[in-house]
């Protein structure tokens, strides 16, 4: 495994309602497969839209950099019956992994209730350790060339997080990664639209998850 070809783990943003969590649980990539045909920001707000086609992060990572997803026969790597692709021992370093933390909070696969950020961060820790183990199996001591072997000590991944997903990732890095065997597993964190200083809108909603984003506490 050579940088920058580390596994990419996508952590999606906030889904407030039960219906939104169900919709998220129904999407294999939780929005990471959504593209665009226009620039969504411009210096001049009155300027006409500019056409620019971006296929989606998932498609671009596959077509330009050789990444692939880890779903096999309708299962995810966190499912008990997941099996690697034929001829493989685990997953490649160039893998796109989606952290499906809202599955348990949907009515489709769980109790329909959201959980605290700390709970989601612990789940992210578990997922990263699972990815580490599978990459080590695929590109470990028997890797070709041997010098490219991946071990638990040198394993790294990228975290790409949107909105509240950035808060989950930060909690993992700051509180869990150093003490749960993750070492320096997160090589880089990319956050998109994360309310690092809280969100004024959180004061509008009287739900536990919104309280974690308030700016006055």
Whereabouts are the PLM-identified features?
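Structural recognition of the beta-strand scaffold that forms the well-ordered cores
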Residues: 7-11, 95-100, 158-159, 188-191
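Short amphipathic alpha-helix adjacent to the substrate-entry channel of hydrolases
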Residues: 52-70, 78-87
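Gly/Ala-rich beta-loop-alpha elbow adjacent to hydrolase catalytic centers
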Residues: 160-161, 165, 169, 193
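Alpha/beta-hydrolase fold nucleophile elbow
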Residues: 141-162
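Helical cap/lid subdomain of alpha/beta-hydrolase-fold lipid enzymes
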Residues: 5, 10, 16-57, 62-63, ...
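Long, low-complexity, polar/charged, intrinsically disordered or flexibly structured peripheral segments
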Residues: 73-89, 98, 137-140
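Cap/lid segment of the alpha/beta-hydrolase catalytic domain
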Residues: 98-115
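A short, charged/proline- and glycine-enriched loop
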Residues: 2-6, 92-94, 153-155
